[in-house]
Amino acid sequence: MLELPFTTIRPNCRLRQNLGILIILQCVLTCYNFNLEQRLPIVKYGHPHSHFGYSVATHTIGEANGPNKTNCVLVGAPLDQNRQPNTTHSGALWRCPMTQRFDDCEQVITDGRRNFDSEILSPPGNDEIKEDQWMGVTVRSNPLQANGSGGKVIVCAHRYMYIVRENRYGQGLCYLLTNDLQFEEVHEPCKGRPVQRQHEDYGLCQAGTSAALLDDDTMVLGSPGPYTWRGSIWVTQVGGEYLQRDKTTYYSDHSDLNSPVDKYSYLGMSVTGGRFFGHMSYAAGAPRSEGHGQVVIFDKSTDNPIPVHSILDGEQFGSSFGYELATADINGDHRPDLIVAAPLYFTKTEGGAVYVYQNIQDTLPMKYTLKLTGPLESRFGLALANIGDLNKDNCEDLAVGAPYEGNGVVYIYLGSSQGLNSKPAQKIQASELGGTIPNGQPIRTFGISISGNTDLDDNSYPDVVIGAFNSSAAVILLARPIISIQTSVQRKELHNMDPNTPGCLDDPASNLTCFTFRACCSIEPYDEKNKELRLAYSVEAETFDHLKKFSRVFFFDRENKRTNVLSRVVRVHTNGRTECQAVTGYIKANTRDIQTPVRFRLKYSLVEPPLADSALVRLNPILDQTQAHVDFEGTFQKDCGDDDLCESNLIIRVEPNITESSGNEYTLILDETELEVRINVSNLADSAYEAQLFIAHQAGVSYVATKKPTNATCNSYNTTLVACSLGNPMLRDTTTFVTIRFQPKGLEPSEKIMLFHIFANTTSKLVGPERPERDLRVNVVRRAKLNFRGWAIPEQSFYSGSSVANSVANTAATDIEGHGPMGMDDVGSQVHHMFTIFNEGPSTAPKVQMVIHWPYSLYSDPQSGRPVQYLLYLEQVPTVEVSQGECHVAKEYVNPLNLASGSRENPAYLSAPAQMRMFPSQSRHSFNKSLIHSQRSYYSSSHRDDHSDDTQSNRNRVRRSFLERVTRLERLMYDPESSNAANGKKQDIVELDCNKGATNCVRIECDILNMPALSEAQVVVKARLWNSTLVSEYPRVERVRIFSTATAQIPESYGVEVMDHNNIEVETRAYPELRNQQRDTSIPWLIIILGIVGGLLLLALVTYVLWKVGFFKRIRPTDPTLSGNLEKMNEEKPFLAPSKNTHHVF
């Protein structure tokens, strides 16, 4: 092996040269990985819109392996103009030579010849219709053998019609041609058969829709039309001497009673044959049979009708299973295998399917052995062809057409001793064909027809022709020669590499551990002209096939840059001798993994010379890729015994820190505490290199930390995995203890179990009776203690007055007093029921469902027609306060009368003094004083006879009644509790709740979301106590007790245990206002006497005290008239002279 002299390249050219090598490698390895040369296609074009290429066949004139043979391609053009006179679109058969020209095909004479010797073509007869007969819809050929068998060509026109009186019958016809494409005979298998019932007989036979020429000189024609499109096949002997051959036409049973398929099955849409069961059999596709399609296999027989051997079923409705058939020996066992296409098969990502039934000891299985599928809407399998042995492995290969994948694609699948490979060896796309297109239009519907298994360029490899009818084109792809190569590696230094010892034989001064191996190959001679080949080889370490993202070793390229992929070009002699090239690699510093071998891949590819102008001039060879690469590995020196194989036995024990456990069942009450998992890992055998422990957990469980002390180093690898390093290596007979803390607070409410998958691994080989893995299951219990209470604001309410407002119609519009629309304050006092939930924990309540049964109205039969007697009239939808949530109640129960807030706008009311505007239902004032003003009216009036006076009188009474209500300040209140204590009378109490059937109750549902421990939520229900209902129904009771009931629970789906029973009742007490009842003012006589006596004693005591303090002593001024001494007094003296003891009295 001679490496190219890179050292002679100038420095400024090295980069360019290396880039060229990489480009060559990439092109060779990825672009053209098989031997059909799509870069140099030979394209033949027909007339536009003629459907040229709808059918194709490779053909050899002369003996297949003879010296004077002529290779050509036969192309059907069903809408082309035939050479027969008086026809325009009857279809034609074309013969295309093996040249590079586009337009050198010649039409083969088919129609119009009346006898063998005449060259004159006659127009169609009066009893036939050739227009649109689709001559060339089917073209088949088989090679001429040395014994004289084969070499025939069949071309059909399935729409050919003949005329009987005024009726036209589309029975179809086929021409059998000789090896040199001369007319031999015409086949019309349906001619002369009954047509009285039109399509129910043979009126639309359509013979020639499919055809096959078998290797036993048998011709099989398919006709899907007989007997209401049941279909049939026709088998005829076409080989050998005419006088000696069997001229009987054998057919399948298509009668109403015995046909293997039902009407509209299209049996005969495709045909093939082979020795599937050790003897000759014929297969026919019925793509519409049973809806999913079937393939019926008939045995060869000398009796009519030929017997049915077996039936294969499709797997999907409407998939057209059996639309196309092919026979090939895909595993080289000399037993034919059956391939069935279902081009209309589909899934969300697939369009079209091909099923392989591999022959096993002369038996076809009823279930397919391999299924191939194509891209969506590609109609993968619309064409199938046995294309021969492309790679010389004695197994025939398969071509599958997908004409509607883009502009068309053909897939090449290689056979092997194990069967057909499921991965295509080559994908030929119309958009990637090389060469020049003469009309500038891209080729479309590429792959509508395929033919092969003929060596058209005489290089001993079969070639392929592909039709594209939408572009009126046929594409010939020639097969490139395959060079056989043997690849090997000499790798002595790759055994027991010591990462602690630097250098190697080829680089002893290196500071890194290095190694050297030799890449070798040998090429057998394949051509006398080529004695030497340029090969590109690459050595890749560890990153191929996605083994690793980074490699532990590297190479130096020509620019001394580190790389794990080394690429070079060498020259190799094609003399079968082995030639080698040395490759030196280096181990990276601080490499931890010394247990796993280092894997390498050596791969060779051919550096091609420039393409020739034509595939007919020269085809560049291609390496056999199955032998062009080899994988090998290098091992490290380890302390693992003489066999250099480390066998470790890791044992895991797991235990959580949960005291509440039963056997292997653990239960954790979810609160603020953490979960600790104690893990013991023991190694009972050889040292475990890169020993690691992994704990997989749910995303809602978070890793907190690892408790100390421990020899392991743990980290969170991602949100669901904790990775711990146990040592490198973990020595024999050692145990590592790890305690890991987890916080389960993030678990979803639906997660009721914590699952931990705990496992250990090592780069050493694991041995032992069981794998080092354990599963820990911890049941999660959420408990929440809900403290549920409720109360009413106010607890007591009062009602009085008349029941005139009880009418729903009056309330909704205008009350009878004519004061305008009713308001909330007009119907009754406001009542609030408060429901409070307190979560005492320990767990969060993700959702609390509260259901309130609300006494909406008194019970009444809905069919009675009575108006609704509201009880607690809902003002609005209840609300959730303090916490998140909402309540739901049917809309028809929330303020159905559309009452506005406040009171009606009565002019008399608005003109009254502010201190007198105390309406009976103004609860904000009356509740605080525990006082509700009476609604009873006091008025008097005389009766009026006329209606107008009566109306005016009513209005006056209303005004007086209203003013009396709002101005009267003195009220006679009734306290039932004190009354009972005083006189011991029995109370008349009414209880209204949802459990006794006396009320119509509304269901209010409230959802309270996400209540953490020690949080509170409150639901407020605002309503009005409907005054008129109580006045009309309970005017003389002691009190009315109205209950709303509520329950609170957490849905079971959240897995939270509620520790208390949460059912409560909230009561509103309604009292009648008894202002007209007489007070009991009688006082016992004893109390009167004691009162008088007590009063007299008190008076005497007060009098005595006053006497003591001199209250009764009076001091008067000096007055002579009082003493009886009268004397005359000077006028100078004052009229009143003060005495000695003068006291001034003011």
From Swiss-Prot:
Residues 938-958 are annotated as: Disordered. It comes from the Eukaryota. It is found in: Apical cell membrane; Lateral cell membrane; Basal cell membrane. GO terms for biological process: actin filament organization; apposition of dorsal and ventral imaginal disc-derived wing surfaces; axon guidance; axonal defasciculation; cell adhesion; cell adhesion mediated by integrin; cell differentiation; cell migration. The chain crosses the membrane at residues 1086-1106. SMART domains: Int_alpha. Residues 942-952 have a biased composition (Basic and acidic residues). FG-GAP repeats lie at residues 38-105, 121-186, 193-245, 254-303, 304-366, 367-422, 432-494. InterPro entries: FG-GAP, Int_alpha_beta-p, Integrin_alpha, Integrin_alpha_C_CS, Integrin_alpha_Ig-like_1, Integrin_alpha_Ig-like_2, Integrin_alpha_Ig-like_3, Integrin_alpha_N. Keywords: Cell adhesion, Cell membrane, Cleavage on pair of basic residues, Disulfide bond, Glycoprotein, Integrin, Membrane, Receptor, Repeat, Signal, Transmembrane, Transmembrane helix. Residues 1107-1146 are cytoplasmic. One of its GO terms (molecular function) is extracellular matrix binding. Residues 1-30 form the signal peptide. Its main location: membrane. Expressed in follicle cells (at protein level). At syncytial blastoderm stage, expressed in the ectoderm but not in the mesodermal precursors. At embryonic stage 7, expressed in dorsal and ventrolateral ectoderm and in some yolk nuclei. At late stage 10, expression is homogeneous in the ectoderm and is particularly abundant in the anterior and posterior midgut primordia. At stage 11, strongly expressed in a metameric pattern in the ectoderm, in the proctodeum and in the posterior midgut primordium. Glycans are attached at residues 68, 86, 147, 470, 511, 657, 680, 711, 718, 761, 928, 1027. GO terms for cellular component: apical plasma membrane; basal plasma membrane; external side of plasma membrane; focal adhesion; integrin complex; lateral plasma membrane; plasma membrane. SUPFAM superfamilies: Integrin alpha N-terminal domain, Integrin domains. Belongs to the integrin alpha chain family. Heterodimer of an alpha and a beta subunit. The alpha subunit is composed of a heavy and a light chain linked by a disulfide bond. Alpha-PS1 associates with beta-PS. Integrin alpha-PS1/beta-PS is a receptor for laminin. This is Integrin alpha-PS1. It comes from Drosophila melanogaster.
